[in-house]
């Protein structure tokens, strides 16, 4: 589902992705606070799908902000093979692993998943896990509150 929000003008480019981290103290008295923050879920990853041309003043972003339309971003992660079913909705849980130097660690512990997600496709490549876990690479879309 697409949502309207504001983002720094320098960052407002179609195709850019971001993880929403919440509002700052500087946002409390801003007249745009509602549109900036009320449509987004903290910790969720979004992709900018369109940018409007008007620029608005902002105390956080030096060059102001633009109105953008965003949608949950699709990205790849690693999950347990037994859970890797196309179309299934899962509640995210990181793969149990403490091997922070492993090349797969960030895919097993991804940022930008807020709760539930839907598996949109499964890759066939073999994943070598240092801990011996049976893993699959999948493409997912985070489900925000309005999609649940």
Curated annotation (Swiss-Prot):
Family membership noted in the UniProt record: Belongs to the UPF0179 family.
HAMAP family documented for this protein: UPF0179 (MF_00498)
Pfam families associated with the record: UPF0179 (PF03684)
Organism of this sequence: Methanococcus vannielii (strain ATCC 35089 / DSM 1224 / JCM 13029 / OCM 148 / SB)
InterPro entries assigned: UPF0179 (IPR005369)
Protein name listed in UniProt: UPF0179 protein Mevan_0979
Lineage of source species: Archaea, Methanobacteriati, Methanobacteriota, Methanomada group, Methanococci
């Amino acid at each position: 589902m697409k949502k309207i929000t504001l983002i720094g003008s320098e960052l407002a480019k179609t195709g850019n992705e971001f993880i929403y981290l919440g509002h700052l103290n500087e946002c409390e008295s801003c007249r745009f606070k509602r549109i900036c923050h009320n449509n987004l879920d903290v910790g969720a990853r979004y992709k900018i799908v369109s940018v409007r041309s008007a620029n608005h003043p902002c105390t956080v972003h030096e060059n102001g902000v633009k109105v953008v339309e965003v949608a949950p971003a699709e990205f790849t992660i690693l999950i347990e093979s037994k859970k890797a079913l196309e179309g299934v909705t899962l509640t995210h849980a990181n793969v149990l692993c403490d091997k922070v130097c492993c090349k797969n660690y960030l895919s097993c512990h991804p940022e930008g998943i807020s709760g539930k997600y839907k598996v949109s496709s499964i890759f066939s490549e073999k994943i070598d896990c240092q801990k011996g876990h049976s893993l699959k690479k999948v493409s997912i879309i985070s489900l925000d509150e309005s999609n649940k």
